[in-house]
Amino acid sequence: MVKVAILHEGNAKKTNDNELLKLLIQELELDSERVVFFGMGVKSNFFKPEYPSYKNIKNSIENEEINKLLFVIDADYEHNDQKYGGYQNTEKALKNIIAELGFQNDSDIYIVCDPKTQEGYLESLILSSIPLQHKNCIQDFLYCSEFKSKDNHKSILNQIL
């Protein structure tokens, strides 16, 4: 059975990213047996051509076990990482590594972020979808509390869920 490989941040077993992707696959009534997850660890691993998962994927493509790749990666914030942070930097770096690996004909990219700011991560995307009244409440709390965590969206979402 030819499979689709989904490459995402974190580990392959259980992260917010792959749990959400599994729910989406289920909701769309797609065959989950045809999907294999590759947890790439930290974001910078995506941009290392020697990363071990890439060798496994390349072998699986050559053996016709995998015929499609989906790269799911956080945009993060440009002010935190001038090289890979922000939507445009992430997209450029990811397209470069995909071309270097020879995966361009087999790949799609989804950069996870707040669609309005094009920055952030999975939690930013989820929080961007909540009603404005709730979003304002969260922003007011952050302002009043002077809560300055680098991962505000992650912290908030983990408390809400």
Predicted regions and their residues:
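Conserved helicase/translocase motor-coupling segment
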Residues: 43-53
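N-terminal polybasic phosphate/anion-binding patch
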Residues: 35-45
